[in-house]
């Protein structure tokens, strides 16, 4: 069955998804802007693979968010802080049965939607200020997703895959609904590994656990994952941050299936990799700090769990971001 899909944010991950979904027979529309929009409208989207070969999707559609019409599935592939400003326009991409797939890093804005317990339907101000996403997109539309691949937009309309093809999907309720099953089947047919999780929040925390630690520490120190893990003081800092976050997560029912030491060892094994947050500092871009760290601090406040180390790292990283944005240029030690 062919799906009618809009991809909001035709960057690295959005382009990767869109090319493969289009080539497997789905109707894909990229919501883009600027030179990227012009390139896709003129030439389609190209995906350069790890082995040096390329895939080209010439027949995809592309338009601005204000020109787009409703679709059956709407993929949100931009960064977390970029969603709220266009939440109202995203809402206009939806008909009564549209599913919205959230692919952002960090704690999602819909985290407490229908989550059984004392915090059910609590809204998170750190990642959805003013409740724009809750109001205009609606948590009932959401399918959660965890993104594992790495890719790069190397030119307008051209994406390079670095590695990976796994996207885990899950309903906030944990049910294997018709809509999530149909989407998973379409993604598998397109060549992705797409398990459907019955506990998407715990799946999100597995990735978040590393991101909330290594991203801000790398931004502050300009160190790679390998450097952070090999230096005793920053390795200990990472362990302390992860322990504070684990306490918050477990209070909310999250199950951590590996130890802190194993999670750090996994990051160390990645090697001399610059995190996305460090790359954003180097290029003078806004950070995903609220989604990755501010949201976890907010969860701690809600649960009455202190997070002193997370608070300190957040404060320093927030000031660094403000300084970089105020000066209008990136900061690099290379």
Indicate residue ranges for each PLM-predicted region.
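Nucleotide donor/acceptor-binding cores
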Residues: 3-4, 72, 165
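Conserved beta-strand termini and adjacent loop/short-helix elements that scaffold enzyme active sites
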Residues: 31, 50, 63-65, 145-147, ...
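NAD(P)+-binding Rossmann beta1-loop-alpha1 motif at the extreme N-terminus of oxidoreductases
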Residues: 1-50
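Short, hinge-like loop/turn segments at secondary-structure boundaries
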Residues: 46-49, 117-120, 159-162, 213-214, ...
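Rossmann-like NAD(P)(H) cofactor-binding subdomain of soluble oxidoreductases
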Residues: 54-154
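Internal alpha-helical scaffold of NAD(P)-dependent oxidoreductase catalytic cores
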Residues: 39, 93, 134-207, 213, ...
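NAD(P)-dependent Rossmann-like dehydrogenase/reductase catalytic/cofactor-binding core
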Residues: 2-3, 227, 235-334
């Amino acid at each position: 069955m062919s799906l009618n899909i809009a991809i909001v944010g035709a960057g690295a991950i959005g382009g990767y998804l869109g090319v493969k979904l289009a080539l497997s027979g789905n109707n894909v529309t990229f919501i883009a802007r600027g030179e990227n929009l012009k390139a896709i409208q003129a030439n389609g989207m190209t995906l350069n693979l790890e082995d040096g070969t390329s895939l080209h999707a010439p027949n995809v559609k592309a338009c601005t968010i204000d020109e787009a019409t409703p679709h059956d599935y709407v993929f949100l592939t931009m960064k977390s802080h970029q969603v709220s400003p266009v939440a109202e326009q995203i809402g206009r991409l939806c008909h009564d049965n549209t599913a919205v797939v959230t692919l952002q890093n960090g704690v999602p804005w819909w985290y407490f939607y229908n989550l059984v317990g004392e915090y059910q339907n609590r809204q998170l101000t750190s990642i959805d200020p003013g409740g724009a996403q809750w109001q205009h997109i609606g948590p009932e539309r959401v399918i959660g997703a965890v993104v594992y691949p790495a890719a790069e937009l190397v030119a307008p309309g051209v994406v390079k895959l670095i590695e990976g093809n796994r996207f885990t999907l899950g309903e906030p309720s944990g049910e294997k609904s018709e809509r999530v099953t149909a989407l998973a089947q379409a993604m598998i047919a397109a060549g992705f590994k797409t398990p459907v999780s019955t506990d998407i929040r715990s799946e999100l925390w597995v990735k978040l656990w590393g991101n909330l630690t290594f991203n801000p520490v790398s931004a502050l120190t300009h160190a790679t994952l390998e450097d952070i893990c090999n230096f005793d003081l920053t390795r200990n800092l990472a362990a302390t941050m992860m322990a504070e976050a684990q306490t918050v997560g477990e209070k909310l029912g999250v199950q951590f299936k590996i130890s802190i030491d194993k999670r750090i060892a996994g990051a160390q094994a990645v090697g001399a990799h610059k995190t996305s947050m460090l790359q954003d500092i180097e290029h003078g871009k806004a950070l995903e700090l609220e989604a990755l760290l501010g949201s976890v601090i907010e969860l701690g406040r809600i649960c009455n769990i202190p997070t002193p180390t997370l608070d300190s790292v957040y404060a320093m990283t927030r000031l660094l971001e403000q300084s970089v944005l105020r000066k209008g240029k990136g900061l690099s030690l290379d």
